[in-house]
Amino acid sequence: MTYSLSAALCVLAIAGFSWLTGQAAQAKLGLQDGESEPDACLLSFMVGFGLLICVLFVLATAQLLRPLPVGAALGLVTVISLAYLWKSAGGWRNIFGPTPSRPRPVGMLLVLALFLLLSLRAFAPALEWDELAYHLPVARDFARSGGLTVFENLRYPLNAWNLHLVWSGALMFGSEAAPHLVNACLAVL
C-alpha cells in the first residue's frame, strides 16, 4: 500500500507543480483569457512540465540532483508561482478560475477511468525491454550520482533525455512504480 501511495503522491506533486507553474507562466505572458477551459488547463500543465524539466536539468548539470536541492528548488518555484498568481489574480478564488455553471460528471468520470486503467498498468512489472535495460537504469544512475552521468561505451556518452531526469526525480521521492505512473499520466496528454 505504501508502495503505490508514495508513487501516487509523487505524481500528484509533479502534476500540481506543473499546473501551478504553467498557470503562472501563462499569466505572466498574458496568455490567459480568464476562462477555465480544459485546453487552457492542459496547456498550463504542459508548460509547467517543461519548466519542471528545465529545473531538473539545471540541477543535474550542477550535480545537485538530490532530494534536498530538488525539493528546495521546486518548493521555491512553487511559492514564487503562487505569489505571482495571488498578486495577479487578486485572491485564491480567482487563481483556480471561475466556477463552472454546471458540473460535468461524465467527463470527470471518463478522465478518472482512463487514469485508473493507466495506473493499473503502471503498477504492474515493466515488460518492455527498452525500459528495463536502458531507460530505468539510466534514471537510477542519475538519481544515485546526483547529476548527469557520462556513459563511456555509448555512442553519445552524455545522453540526458528529459524523461530520464523526470524519472530520476520520481525515483528519489517515490517508489519504483513512480516513474511508470508518471509515464502513464503523460500518456493521458
Where are these regions (language model features)?
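Generic alpha-helical structural element
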Residues: C10-I14, L43, V47, M108, ...
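A generic short alpha-helical patch detector that favors 3-5-residue windows
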Residues: F17, M46, G50, G107, ...
